[in-house]
Protein backbone atom coordinates (compact mmCIF):
# COMPACT_ATOMS: atom_id res chain seq x y z
CA UNK A 1 0.00 0.00 0.00
CA UNK A 2 2.88 2.35 0.72
CA UNK A 3 4.20 1.70 -2.73
CA UNK A 4 0.83 2.40 -4.36
CA UNK A 5 0.34 5.67 -2.45
CA UNK A 6 3.92 6.65 -3.19
CA UNK A 7 3.41 6.00 -6.88
CA UNK A 8 0.21 8.05 -7.06
CA UNK A 9 1.74 10.89 -5.06
CA UNK A 10 4.97 10.86 -7.08
CA UNK A 11 3.05 11.35 -10.28
CA UNK A 12 1.54 14.55 -8.86
CA UNK A 13 4.75 15.97 -7.27
CA UNK A 14 7.89 17.25 -8.77
CA UNK A 15 11.01 15.19 -9.36
CA UNK A 16 13.20 17.44 -7.19
CA UNK A 17 11.32 16.42 -3.99
CA UNK A 18 11.61 12.63 -4.49
CA UNK A 19 14.90 12.03 -2.52
CA UNK A 20 13.54 13.89 0.48
CA UNK A 21 10.36 11.86 0.48
CA UNK A 22 12.28 8.57 0.36
CA UNK A 23 14.47 9.60 3.29
CA UNK A 24 11.43 10.38 5.44
CA UNK A 25 9.81 7.01 4.68
CA UNK A 26 12.97 5.01 5.56
CA UNK A 27 13.30 6.86 8.87
CA UNK A 28 9.72 5.92 9.83
CA UNK A 29 10.32 2.24 9.04
CA UNK A 30 13.48 2.26 11.19
CA UNK A 31 11.56 3.56 14.20
CA UNK A 32 9.03 0.71 13.96
CA UNK A 33 11.75 -1.99 13.94
CA UNK A 34 13.50 -0.46 16.99
CA UNK A 35 10.31 -0.50 19.02
CA UNK A 36 9.69 -4.21 18.25
CA UNK A 37 13.25 -5.25 19.16
CA UNK A 38 13.19 -3.37 22.48
CA UNK A 39 9.95 -5.09 23.53
CA UNK A 40 11.43 -8.53 22.73
CA UNK A 41 14.55 -7.89 24.83
CA UNK A 42 12.49 -6.75 27.83
CA UNK A 43 10.46 -9.96 27.70
CA UNK A 44 13.62 -12.07 27.65
CA UNK A 45 15.07 -10.23 30.66
CA UNK A 46 11.86 -10.74 32.64
CA UNK A 47 11.89 -14.50 31.93
CA UNK A 48 15.53 -14.79 33.01
CA UNK A 49 14.80 -13.01 36.28
CA UNK A 50 11.90 -15.39 36.96
CA UNK A 51 14.17 -18.37 36.33
CA UNK A 52 16.83 -17.11 38.74
CA UNK A 53 14.18 -16.47 41.39
CA UNK A 54 12.74 -19.98 40.91
CA UNK A 55 16.03 -21.84 41.48
CA UNK A 56 16.44 -21.12 45.24
CA UNK A 57 12.87 -22.29 45.87
CA UNK A 58 13.55 -25.78 44.46
CA UNK A 59 16.95 -26.32 46.02
CA UNK A 60 17.91 -24.86 49.38
CA UNK A 61 21.41 -24.32 50.65
CA UNK A 62 23.06 -24.65 47.23
CA UNK A 63 25.09 -21.44 47.51
CA UNK A 64 26.90 -22.66 50.58
CA UNK A 65 28.41 -25.69 48.89
CA UNK A 66 31.56 -25.74 46.81
CA UNK A 67 31.37 -25.93 43.03
CA UNK A 68 32.08 -28.99 40.88
CA UNK A 69 32.97 -29.28 37.24
CA UNK A 70 31.23 -31.49 34.70
CA UNK A 71 33.31 -32.49 31.67
CA UNK A 72 31.43 -32.21 28.38
CA UNK A 73 32.43 -33.82 25.13
CA UNK A 74 33.81 -31.45 22.51
CA UNK A 75 31.40 -32.61 19.82
CA UNK A 76 28.28 -32.09 21.86
CA UNK A 77 29.34 -28.69 23.14
CA UNK A 78 30.25 -27.19 19.78
CA UNK A 79 27.36 -28.53 17.79
CA UNK A 80 24.74 -27.81 20.39
CA UNK A 81 25.92 -24.21 21.07
CA UNK A 82 25.36 -23.30 17.45
CA UNK A 83 21.91 -24.85 17.46
CA UNK A 84 21.03 -23.06 20.71
CA UNK A 85 22.06 -19.70 19.25
CA UNK A 86 19.80 -20.22 16.28
CA UNK A 87 16.74 -21.41 18.24
CA UNK A 88 15.67 -18.71 20.64
CA UNK A 89 11.90 -18.88 20.78
CA UNK A 90 10.26 -18.43 24.18
CA UNK A 91 7.69 -21.22 23.68
CA UNK A 92 10.34 -23.95 23.37
CA UNK A 93 12.09 -22.77 26.53
CA UNK A 94 8.89 -22.74 28.55
CA UNK A 95 8.02 -26.33 27.51
CA UNK A 96 11.54 -27.55 28.40
CA UNK A 97 11.24 -25.89 31.81
CA UNK A 98 8.01 -27.77 32.54
CA UNK A 99 9.57 -31.09 31.56
CA UNK A 100 12.62 -30.51 33.77
CA UNK A 101 10.40 -29.54 36.72
CA UNK A 102 8.51 -32.82 36.35
CA UNK A 103 11.75 -34.78 36.28
CA UNK A 104 13.04 -33.05 39.42
CA UNK A 105 9.80 -33.80 41.23
CA UNK A 106 10.20 -37.49 40.31
CA UNK A 107 13.78 -37.46 41.62
CA UNK A 108 12.70 -36.02 44.97
CA UNK A 109 9.99 -38.69 45.32
CA UNK A 110 12.40 -41.64 44.83
CA UNK A 111 12.54 -44.10 47.78
CA UNK A 112 16.22 -44.77 48.30
CA UNK A 113 18.86 -44.20 50.90
CA UNK A 114 20.43 -41.35 48.98
CA UNK A 115 17.21 -39.56 47.89
CA UNK A 116 15.05 -40.17 50.94
CA UNK A 117 14.79 -36.50 52.01
CA UNK A 118 15.77 -33.04 50.84
CA UNK A 119 18.42 -32.86 53.51
CA UNK A 120 20.41 -35.55 51.69
CA UNK A 121 20.03 -33.84 48.29
CA UNK A 122 22.43 -30.99 47.65
CA UNK A 123 22.45 -29.00 44.42
CA UNK A 124 25.82 -27.46 43.69
CA UNK A 125 26.58 -24.83 41.05
CA UNK A 126 29.01 -26.00 38.42
CA UNK A 127 31.11 -24.47 35.69
CA UNK A 128 30.72 -25.63 32.09
CA UNK A 129 33.88 -25.97 30.08
CA UNK A 130 35.19 -27.97 27.16
CA UNK A 131 36.62 -31.31 28.30
CA UNK A 132 38.42 -31.94 25.04
CA UNK A 133 40.56 -28.80 25.16
CA UNK A 134 41.19 -28.67 28.95
CA UNK A 135 44.05 -30.18 30.91
CA UNK A 136 43.98 -31.73 34.40
CA UNK A 137 45.51 -28.54 35.81
CA UNK A 138 42.73 -26.46 34.30
CA UNK A 139 40.12 -28.85 35.68
CA UNK A 140 41.52 -28.45 39.18
CA UNK A 141 41.26 -24.67 38.85
CA UNK A 142 37.58 -25.00 38.00
CA UNK A 143 36.98 -27.13 41.08
CA UNK A 144 38.33 -24.44 43.43
CA UNK A 145 35.87 -22.45 45.51
CA UNK A 146 34.60 -19.20 44.00
CA UNK A 147 33.45 -16.14 45.98
CA UNK A 148 29.79 -15.32 46.01
CA UNK A 149 30.16 -12.27 43.75
CA UNK A 150 32.09 -14.27 41.16
CA UNK A 151 29.49 -17.02 41.35
CA UNK A 152 26.74 -14.54 40.54
CA UNK A 153 28.72 -13.19 37.59
CA UNK A 154 29.36 -16.71 36.31
CA UNK A 155 25.67 -17.56 36.63
CA UNK A 156 24.73 -14.47 34.59
CA UNK A 157 27.24 -15.38 31.92
CA UNK A 158 26.13 -19.02 31.85
CA UNK A 159 22.49 -17.97 31.59
CA UNK A 160 23.30 -16.37 28.25
CA UNK A 161 24.96 -19.56 27.11
CA UNK A 162 22.45 -22.32 26.57
CA UNK A 163 23.39 -25.92 27.33
CA UNK A 164 22.56 -28.34 24.49
CA UNK A 165 19.27 -30.21 24.92
CA UNK A 166 20.82 -33.59 24.10
CA UNK A 167 23.32 -33.19 26.93
CA UNK A 168 20.56 -32.25 29.39
CA UNK A 169 18.51 -35.30 28.42
CA UNK A 170 21.49 -37.65 28.64
CA UNK A 171 22.43 -36.43 32.14
CA UNK A 172 18.82 -36.71 33.31
CA UNK A 173 18.65 -40.32 32.05
CA UNK A 174 21.93 -40.94 33.83
CA UNK A 175 20.32 -39.86 37.11
CA UNK A 176 17.01 -41.64 36.61
CA UNK A 177 18.54 -45.03 35.76
CA UNK A 178 21.24 -45.24 38.46
CA UNK A 179 24.20 -44.28 36.36
CA UNK A 180 23.49 -46.93 33.68
CA UNK A 181 22.06 -44.87 30.79
CA UNK A 182 22.88 -47.45 28.14
CA UNK A 183 20.30 -49.88 29.55
CA UNK A 184 17.33 -47.49 29.60
CA UNK A 185 18.07 -44.62 27.20
CA UNK A 186 16.89 -44.66 23.63
CA UNK A 187 19.15 -44.96 20.61
CA UNK A 188 19.15 -41.17 20.27
CA UNK A 189 20.42 -40.76 23.82
CA UNK A 190 23.11 -43.45 23.47
CA UNK A 191 24.88 -41.37 20.83
CA UNK A 192 25.68 -38.74 23.49
CA UNK A 193 26.87 -41.15 26.21
CA UNK A 194 30.56 -41.12 26.94
CA UNK A 195 32.39 -44.40 26.30
CA UNK A 196 33.59 -44.51 29.92
CA UNK A 197 29.97 -44.73 31.15
CA UNK A 198 29.15 -47.80 29.06
CA UNK A 199 29.27 -51.13 30.97
CA UNK A 200 32.28 -53.24 30.30
CA UNK A 201 31.52 -56.27 28.14
CA UNK A 202 34.09 -59.06 27.99
CA UNK A 203 35.44 -59.75 24.55
CA UNK A 204 35.90 -63.49 24.85
CA UNK A 205 34.61 -66.14 27.21
CA UNK A 206 37.11 -67.97 29.35
CA UNK A 207 37.74 -71.55 28.36
CA UNK A 208 36.53 -73.90 31.07
CA UNK A 209 38.08 -77.30 31.70
CA UNK A 210 36.56 -80.33 30.08
CA UNK A 211 35.42 -81.83 33.39
CA UNK A 212 33.51 -78.70 34.44
CA UNK A 213 29.76 -78.68 33.92
CA UNK A 214 27.91 -75.41 33.22
CA UNK A 215 24.71 -76.77 34.74
CA UNK A 216 23.68 -75.69 38.23
CA UNK A 217 24.90 -77.59 41.25
CA UNK A 218 23.28 -81.01 41.76
CA UNK A 219 21.42 -81.60 44.99
CA UNK A 220 22.92 -84.14 47.36
CA UNK A 221 21.38 -86.32 50.07
CA UNK A 222 22.70 -88.08 53.13
CA UNK A 223 21.48 -91.69 52.89
CA UNK A 224 20.68 -93.39 56.20
CA UNK A 225 19.31 -96.93 56.28
CA UNK A 226 18.34 -99.20 59.12
CA UNK A 227 16.52 -102.52 59.29
CA UNK A 228 13.08 -102.45 60.85
CA UNK A 229 12.60 -105.07 63.60
CA UNK A 230 9.76 -107.56 63.45
CA UNK A 231 8.14 -106.11 66.59
CA UNK A 232 7.23 -102.92 64.69
CA UNK A 233 5.54 -104.92 61.96
CA UNK A 234 3.53 -107.48 63.95
CA UNK A 235 1.36 -104.84 65.66
CA UNK A 236 -0.85 -104.56 62.62
CA UNK A 237 -3.56 -107.13 62.11
CA UNK A 238 -3.79 -109.10 58.84
CA UNK A 239 -7.01 -107.27 57.96
CA UNK A 240 -5.32 -103.88 58.31
CA UNK A 241 -2.38 -105.03 56.23
CA UNK A 242 -4.68 -106.35 53.50
CA UNK A 243 -6.72 -103.13 53.55
CA UNK A 244 -3.58 -101.01 53.25
CA UNK A 245 -2.34 -103.08 50.33
CA UNK A 246 -5.74 -102.85 48.61
CA UNK A 247 -6.41 -99.18 49.18
CA UNK A 248 -2.83 -98.04 49.03
CA UNK A 249 -3.29 -96.05 52.22
CA UNK A 250 -0.31 -94.99 54.30
CA UNK A 251 -0.54 -95.63 58.02
CA UNK A 252 2.11 -93.08 58.82
CA UNK A 253 0.05 -89.96 59.49
CA UNK A 254 2.98 -87.57 59.60
CA UNK A 255 4.14 -88.69 56.18
CA UNK A 256 0.66 -88.21 54.74
CA UNK A 257 0.50 -84.70 56.16
CA UNK A 258 3.89 -83.97 54.71
CA UNK A 259 2.77 -85.16 51.28
CA UNK A 260 -0.40 -83.11 51.33
CA UNK A 261 1.46 -80.07 52.62
CA UNK A 262 4.18 -80.23 49.98
CA UNK A 263 2.17 -81.51 47.03
CA UNK A 264 3.47 -78.95 44.60
CA UNK A 265 7.06 -79.60 45.60
CA UNK A 266 6.59 -83.33 45.15
CA UNK A 267 5.10 -82.83 41.71
CA UNK A 268 8.01 -80.66 40.71
CA UNK A 269 10.49 -83.22 42.02
CA UNK A 270 8.72 -85.95 40.08
CA UNK A 271 8.89 -83.90 36.91
CA UNK A 272 12.59 -83.31 37.44
CA UNK A 273 13.07 -86.99 38.22
CA UNK A 274 11.23 -87.99 35.03
CA UNK A 275 13.25 -85.53 32.98
CA UNK A 276 16.51 -86.88 34.35
CA UNK A 277 15.46 -90.45 33.58
CA UNK A 278 14.64 -89.45 30.03
CA UNK A 279 18.04 -87.81 29.67
CA UNK A 280 19.75 -90.89 31.04
CA UNK A 281 17.82 -93.12 28.65
CA UNK A 282 18.84 -90.92 25.74
CA UNK A 283 22.47 -91.11 26.80
CA UNK A 284 22.24 -94.88 27.10
CA UNK A 285 20.72 -95.14 23.62
CA UNK A 286 23.47 -92.99 22.18
CA UNK A 287 26.12 -95.08 23.88
CA UNK A 288 24.55 -98.27 22.56
CA UNK A 289 24.44 -96.85 19.05
CA UNK A 290 28.09 -95.88 19.27
CA UNK A 291 29.04 -99.32 20.51
CA UNK A 292 27.08 -101.01 17.74
CA UNK A 293 28.68 -98.74 15.17
CA UNK A 294 32.17 -99.55 16.44
CA UNK A 295 31.67 -103.28 16.76
CA UNK A 296 30.09 -103.74 13.32
CA UNK A 297 30.28 -107.25 11.95
CA UNK A 298 31.91 -108.56 15.10
CA UNK A 299 28.77 -107.84 17.11
CA UNK A 300 26.59 -109.58 14.52
CA UNK A 301 28.77 -112.67 14.66
CA UNK A 302 28.50 -112.77 18.43
CA UNK A 303 24.71 -112.54 18.20
CA UNK A 304 24.62 -115.46 15.79
CA UNK A 305 26.78 -117.55 18.09
CA UNK A 306 24.53 -116.74 21.04
CA UNK A 307 21.49 -117.89 19.08
CA UNK A 308 23.13 -121.16 18.16
CA UNK A 309 24.56 -121.82 21.63
CA UNK A 310 22.20 -120.05 23.95
CA UNK A 311 23.15 -121.86 27.13
CA UNK A 312 26.81 -120.99 26.71
CA UNK A 313 26.12 -117.26 26.43
CA UNK A 314 23.71 -116.67 29.28
CA UNK A 315 23.95 -113.44 31.22
CA UNK A 316 25.94 -113.91 34.41
CA UNK A 317 24.02 -111.23 36.35
CA UNK A 318 20.73 -113.05 35.89
CA UNK A 319 19.65 -116.24 37.59
CA UNK A 320 16.98 -118.23 35.77
CA UNK A 321 15.40 -120.75 38.10
CA UNK A 322 13.60 -122.41 35.18
CA UNK A 323 16.99 -123.41 33.74
CA UNK A 324 18.45 -124.64 37.02
CA UNK A 325 18.65 -128.46 36.94
CA UNK A 326 18.07 -128.62 40.69
CA UNK A 327 14.88 -126.55 40.44
CA UNK A 328 13.58 -128.62 37.52
CA UNK A 329 14.47 -131.91 39.18
CA UNK A 330 12.69 -130.90 42.39
CA UNK A 331 9.55 -129.71 40.54
CA UNK A 332 9.23 -132.45 37.89
CA UNK A 333 7.53 -135.76 38.82
CA UNK A 334 9.85 -137.83 36.62
CA UNK A 335 13.52 -137.26 35.81
CA UNK A 336 15.57 -139.55 33.56
CA UNK A 337 18.68 -139.55 31.40
CA UNK A 338 18.64 -140.83 27.82
CA UNK A 339 19.85 -140.55 24.22
CA UNK A 340 17.92 -139.82 21.03
CA UNK A 341 17.51 -142.80 18.75
CA UNK A 342 15.39 -141.25 16.01
CA UNK A 343 13.88 -137.85 15.06
CA UNK A 344 11.58 -136.56 12.34
CA UNK A 345 13.26 -135.45 9.14
CA UNK A 346 11.21 -132.23 8.88
CA UNK A 347 12.01 -130.21 12.00
CA UNK A 348 10.94 -126.75 10.84
CA UNK A 349 7.86 -126.35 13.09
CA UNK A 350 6.84 -129.43 15.06
CA UNK A 351 8.58 -132.78 15.21
CA UNK A 352 8.78 -135.92 17.34
CA UNK A 353 11.74 -137.85 18.71
CA UNK A 354 12.33 -141.24 20.30
CA UNK A 355 14.60 -141.51 23.34
CA UNK A 356 16.17 -144.50 24.99
CA UNK A 357 16.10 -144.29 28.80
CA UNK A 358 19.54 -144.89 30.30
CA UNK A 359 19.06 -143.89 33.94
CA UNK A 360 16.07 -142.86 36.05
CA UNK A 361 16.65 -140.38 38.90
CA UNK A 362 13.04 -139.78 39.88
CA UNK A 363 9.87 -141.71 38.99
CA UNK A 364 6.16 -141.59 39.67
CA UNK A 365 4.88 -144.28 41.98
CA UNK A 366 1.85 -145.37 39.99
CA UNK A 367 3.44 -145.61 36.53
CA UNK A 368 6.37 -147.58 35.16
CA UNK A 369 8.73 -145.78 32.79
CA UNK A 370 9.28 -147.72 29.53
CA UNK A 371 12.66 -148.18 27.87
CA UNK A 372 11.74 -146.17 24.74
CA UNK A 373 9.89 -142.89 25.14
CA UNK A 374 8.23 -140.93 22.33
CA UNK A 375 8.30 -137.15 22.92
CA UNK A 376 6.90 -134.17 20.99
CA UNK A 377 8.75 -130.86 20.45
CA UNK A 378 7.90 -127.46 18.98
CA UNK A 379 10.01 -124.53 17.80
CA UNK A 380 9.65 -121.10 19.36
CA UNK A 381 11.39 -117.78 18.88
CA UNK A 382 11.39 -117.01 22.61
CA UNK A 383 13.99 -118.35 24.98
CA UNK A 384 11.36 -119.68 27.37
CA UNK A 385 10.42 -118.79 30.90
CA UNK A 386 13.06 -117.81 33.42
CA UNK A 387 10.94 -118.16 36.56
CA UNK A 388 10.27 -121.68 37.80
CA UNK A 389 6.94 -120.53 39.22
CA UNK A 390 5.80 -119.58 35.72
CA UNK A 391 7.11 -122.70 34.06
CA UNK A 392 4.37 -125.17 33.16
CA UNK A 393 4.23 -128.76 31.99
CA UNK A 394 3.64 -128.61 28.24
CA UNK A 395 2.60 -131.43 25.87
CA UNK A 396 5.39 -130.30 23.56
CA UNK A 397 8.84 -129.32 24.64
CA UNK A 398 9.86 -125.83 23.45
CA UNK A 399 13.08 -125.48 21.47
CA UNK A 400 14.70 -122.51 19.76
CA UNK A 401 15.94 -124.67 16.89
CA UNK A 402 15.67 -128.26 15.72
CA UNK A 403 19.45 -128.46 15.68
CA UNK A 404 19.59 -128.11 19.48
CA UNK A 405 18.99 -131.85 19.79
CA UNK A 406 21.66 -134.14 18.44
CA UNK A 407 21.15 -137.78 17.61
CA UNK A 408 24.29 -139.55 18.83
CA UNK A 409 25.07 -142.44 21.14
CA UNK A 410 27.64 -140.50 23.17
CA UNK A 411 25.46 -137.39 23.76
CA UNK A 412 22.96 -137.78 26.59
CA UNK A 413 20.19 -135.44 27.71
CA UNK A 414 18.44 -134.93 31.02
CA UNK A 415 14.64 -134.86 30.69
CA UNK A 416 12.12 -133.50 33.23
CA UNK A 417 8.68 -134.90 32.39
CA UNK A 418 5.36 -136.05 33.80
CA UNK A 419 3.79 -139.30 32.66
CA UNK A 420 0.03 -138.92 32.16
CA UNK A 421 -0.42 -142.52 30.90
CA UNK A 422 1.95 -145.26 29.74
CA UNK A 423 2.33 -143.68 26.28
CA UNK A 424 1.92 -139.92 26.84
CA UNK A 425 4.26 -137.42 28.49
CA UNK A 426 4.29 -133.70 29.23
CA UNK A 427 7.61 -131.90 29.35
CA UNK A 428 8.78 -129.35 31.94
CA UNK A 429 11.43 -126.99 30.67
CA UNK A 430 13.87 -127.88 27.93
CA UNK A 431 16.13 -130.88 27.40
CA UNK A 432 19.44 -130.31 29.18
CA UNK A 433 22.68 -131.77 27.97
CA UNK A 434 24.27 -134.01 30.60
CA UNK A 435 27.44 -132.77 32.28
CA UNK A 436 29.10 -133.48 35.59
CA UNK A 437 27.54 -130.39 37.21
CA UNK A 438 24.09 -131.24 35.92
CA UNK A 439 24.24 -134.78 37.27
CA UNK A 440 25.46 -133.55 40.66
CA UNK A 441 22.67 -130.94 40.90
CA UNK A 442 19.99 -133.48 39.97
CA UNK A 443 21.22 -136.08 42.46
CA UNK A 444 21.21 -133.46 45.21
CA UNK A 445 17.73 -132.23 44.36
CA UNK A 446 16.10 -135.67 44.38
CA UNK A 447 17.58 -136.64 47.76
CA UNK A 448 15.36 -136.74 50.86
CA UNK A 449 17.30 -134.19 52.94
CA UNK A 450 17.44 -131.57 50.21
CA UNK A 451 14.56 -129.25 51.16
CA UNK A 452 15.09 -126.19 53.35
CA UNK A 453 12.67 -123.34 53.93
CA UNK A 454 13.44 -119.95 52.47
CA UNK A 455 14.97 -117.34 54.76
CA UNK A 456 16.19 -113.76 54.36
CA UNK A 457 19.54 -113.60 56.12
CA UNK A 458 20.50 -109.96 55.53
CA UNK A 459 19.28 -106.75 53.91
CA UNK A 460 21.31 -103.56 53.47
CA UNK A 461 21.78 -100.62 51.13
CA UNK A 462 24.72 -99.40 49.09
CA UNK A 463 25.74 -96.74 49.96
CA UNK A 464 24.75 -96.51 53.61
CA UNK A 465 25.44 -93.43 55.75
CA UNK A 466 27.00 -91.69 52.79
CA UNK A 467 26.25 -88.72 50.54
CA UNK A 468 24.66 -89.47 47.18
CA UNK A 469 23.89 -86.98 44.44
CA UNK A 470 20.43 -86.43 43.05
CA UNK A 471 19.83 -88.77 40.10
CA UNK A 472 22.49 -91.35 40.99
CA UNK A 473 21.91 -95.07 41.58
CA UNK A 474 21.03 -96.62 44.93
CA UNK A 475 21.38 -100.36 45.57
CA UNK A 476 19.50 -102.46 48.11
CA UNK A 477 20.85 -106.00 48.57
CA UNK A 478 18.85 -108.88 49.99
CA UNK A 479 20.71 -112.10 50.87
CA UNK A 480 18.65 -115.32 51.09
CA UNK A 481 19.13 -118.99 51.85
CA UNK A 482 17.10 -122.16 51.27
CA UNK A 483 16.78 -125.29 49.13
CA UNK A 484 15.78 -125.03 46.37
CA UNK A 485 17.06 -121.47 45.90
CA UNK A 486 14.30 -119.02 46.90
CA UNK A 487 12.53 -116.58 44.65
CA UNK A 488 12.78 -112.92 45.76
CA UNK A 489 10.15 -110.23 45.22
CA UNK A 490 10.40 -106.55 46.20
CA UNK A 491 7.86 -104.23 47.79
CA UNK A 492 7.88 -100.53 48.66
CA UNK A 493 5.43 -99.18 51.22
CA UNK A 494 3.39 -102.43 51.06
CA UNK A 495 3.10 -102.23 47.25
CA UNK A 496 4.77 -104.47 44.69
CA UNK A 497 7.33 -102.75 42.45
CA UNK A 498 8.33 -105.73 40.31
CA UNK A 499 6.60 -104.30 37.22
CA UNK A 500 8.13 -100.82 37.46
CA UNK A 501 11.07 -101.59 35.23
CA UNK A 502 11.50 -97.98 34.14
CA UNK A 503 12.22 -96.87 37.73
CA UNK A 504 13.85 -99.97 39.24
CA UNK A 505 16.27 -102.57 37.99
CA UNK A 506 16.36 -106.11 39.40
CA UNK A 507 19.34 -108.47 39.46
CA UNK A 508 18.48 -111.91 40.78
CA UNK A 509 21.29 -114.25 41.74
CA UNK A 510 21.17 -117.67 43.27
CA UNK A 511 21.71 -116.54 46.86
CA UNK A 512 20.96 -112.82 46.72
CA UNK A 513 18.88 -110.25 44.91
CA UNK A 514 19.70 -106.61 44.14
CA UNK A 515 17.21 -103.78 43.76
CA UNK A 516 18.71 -100.80 41.90
CA UNK A 517 17.00 -97.41 41.94
CA UNK A 518 17.98 -96.04 38.55
CA UNK A 519 17.74 -92.35 39.47
CA UNK A 520 17.37 -91.63 43.16
CA UNK A 521 14.94 -88.90 44.20
CA UNK A 522 14.35 -88.15 47.86
CA UNK A 523 10.65 -87.38 47.49
CA UNK A 524 9.62 -90.53 45.60
CA UNK A 525 12.34 -93.12 46.33
CA UNK A 526 12.85 -92.71 50.07
CA UNK A 527 10.71 -94.98 52.21
CA UNK A 528 10.32 -98.55 53.43
CA UNK A 529 11.52 -101.38 51.20
CA UNK A 530 10.68 -105.02 51.80
CA UNK A 531 12.36 -108.18 50.53
CA UNK A 532 10.21 -111.33 50.41
CA UNK A 533 11.57 -114.81 49.71
CA UNK A 534 9.84 -118.13 49.06
CA UNK A 535 10.65 -121.52 47.53
CA UNK A 536 8.86 -124.72 46.62
CA UNK A 537 9.84 -126.43 49.85
CA UNK A 538 6.97 -124.74 51.75
CA UNK A 539 4.36 -122.02 51.43
CA UNK A 540 5.94 -119.86 54.13
CA UNK A 541 7.18 -116.42 53.07
CA UNK A 542 10.24 -114.89 54.69
CA UNK A 543 10.54 -111.10 54.72
CA UNK A 544 12.73 -108.31 55.95
CA UNK A 545 12.31 -104.56 55.72
CA UNK A 546 14.69 -101.65 55.52
CA UNK A 547 13.97 -97.95 55.92
CA UNK A 548 15.72 -95.53 53.56
CA UNK A 549 15.94 -91.91 54.71
CA UNK A 550 17.38 -89.11 52.59
CA UNK A 551 18.28 -85.82 54.25
CA UNK A 552 19.31 -82.92 51.98
CA UNK A 553 22.87 -81.81 52.48
CA UNK A 554 23.22 -78.05 53.01
CA UNK A 555 26.60 -76.61 52.15
CA UNK A 556 27.82 -73.48 54.00
CA UNK A 557 26.34 -70.25 52.67
CA UNK A 558 29.51 -68.27 53.43
CA UNK A 559 31.60 -69.21 50.43
CA UNK A 560 34.37 -66.70 51.07
CA UNK A 561 36.51 -69.27 52.89
CA UNK A 562 35.32 -72.42 51.10
CA UNK A 563 36.54 -74.01 47.90
CA UNK A 564 39.90 -74.35 46.25
CA UNK A 565 41.58 -72.01 43.75
CA UNK A 566 40.66 -72.57 40.11
CA UNK A 567 43.32 -73.65 37.66
CA UNK A 568 41.72 -71.72 34.79
CA UNK A 569 40.68 -68.12 34.03
CA UNK A 570 37.01 -67.62 34.80
CA UNK A 571 36.51 -64.20 36.52
CA UNK A 572 36.83 -60.76 34.94
CA UNK A 573 38.34 -57.55 36.37
CA UNK A 574 40.92 -59.33 38.59
CA UNK A 575 38.29 -61.39 40.41
CA UNK A 576 39.34 -64.44 42.45
CA UNK A 577 37.99 -67.77 41.17
CA UNK A 578 37.13 -70.54 43.68
CA UNK A 579 35.73 -74.04 43.11
CA UNK A 580 33.73 -76.29 45.45
CA UNK A 581 34.66 -79.87 44.40
CA UNK A 582 31.77 -81.58 46.22
CA UNK A 583 29.07 -79.89 44.15
CA UNK A 584 31.20 -78.95 41.12
CA UNK A 585 30.39 -75.25 41.46
CA UNK A 586 32.56 -72.27 40.49
CA UNK A 587 32.11 -68.77 41.92
CA UNK A 588 34.00 -65.46 41.92
CA UNK A 589 35.03 -63.07 44.68
CA UNK A 590 34.81 -59.67 43.01
CA UNK A 591 36.61 -56.40 43.86
CA UNK A 592 34.63 -53.62 45.52
CA UNK A 593 33.96 -51.83 42.23
CA UNK A 594 32.45 -54.84 40.39
CA UNK A 595 29.71 -57.41 40.92
CA UNK A 596 28.06 -60.32 39.10
CA UNK A 597 28.58 -64.06 38.73
CA UNK A 598 31.84 -63.43 36.88
CA UNK A 599 32.50 -59.82 38.04
CA UNK A 600 31.32 -58.54 34.67
CA UNK A 601 29.24 -55.60 35.98
CA UNK A 602 30.47 -52.34 37.49
CA UNK A 603 28.77 -50.51 40.33
CA UNK A 604 27.38 -47.09 39.29
CA UNK A 605 29.15 -43.89 40.45
CA UNK A 606 27.90 -42.25 43.64
CA UNK A 607 27.64 -38.85 41.90
CA UNK A 608 24.68 -38.03 39.70
CA UNK A 609 24.24 -35.01 37.43
CA UNK A 610 21.22 -32.77 36.93
CA UNK A 611 21.02 -30.38 33.97
CA UNK A 612 18.22 -27.82 34.02
CA UNK A 613 17.56 -24.15 33.16
CA UNK A 614 20.74 -23.81 31.12
CA UNK A 615 22.99 -24.89 34.03
CA UNK A 616 24.49 -28.22 35.07
CA UNK A 617 24.45 -29.20 38.75
CA UNK A 618 25.77 -32.19 40.71
CA UNK A 619 23.65 -34.40 42.97
CA UNK A 620 25.81 -36.25 45.51
CA UNK A 621 25.04 -39.19 47.80
CA UNK A 622 26.12 -38.77 51.40
CA UNK A 623 27.24 -42.21 52.64
Curated annotation (Swiss-Prot):
Keywords recorded for this protein, A-Z: Developmental protein, Disulfide bond, EGF-like domain, Glycoprotein, Growth factor, Immunoglobulin domain, Secreted, Signal
Cleavable signal peptide: 1-40
Function: Ligand for the EGF receptor. Seems to play a role in the global proliferation of wing disc cells and the larval patterning. Shows a strong synergistic genetic interaction with spi, suggesting a molecular interdependence. Required for the development of interveins cells.
GO molecular function: epidermal growth factor receptor binding; growth factor activity; heparin binding; receptor ligand activity; signaling receptor binding
InterPro entries found in the cross-reference section: EGF-like_dom, Ig-like_dom, Ig-like_dom_sf, Ig-like_fold, Ig_I-set, Ig_sub2
Ig-like C2-type domain mapped to chain residues: 457-542
Top-level lineage group: Eukaryota
Glycan-carrying positions: 76, 211, 252, 350, 381, 424, 449, 521, 574
Protein name in the entry: Protein vein
Gene: vn
PANTHER family: IMMUNOGLOBULIN, MYOPALLADIN ISOFORM X1
PROSITE patterns: EGF_1 (PS00022), EGF_3 (PS50026), IG_LIKE (PS50835)
Keyword Secreted: yes
Pfam families noted in UniProt: I-set, Vein_beta-barrel
Disulfide bond sites: 478-531, 566-577, 571-588, 590-599
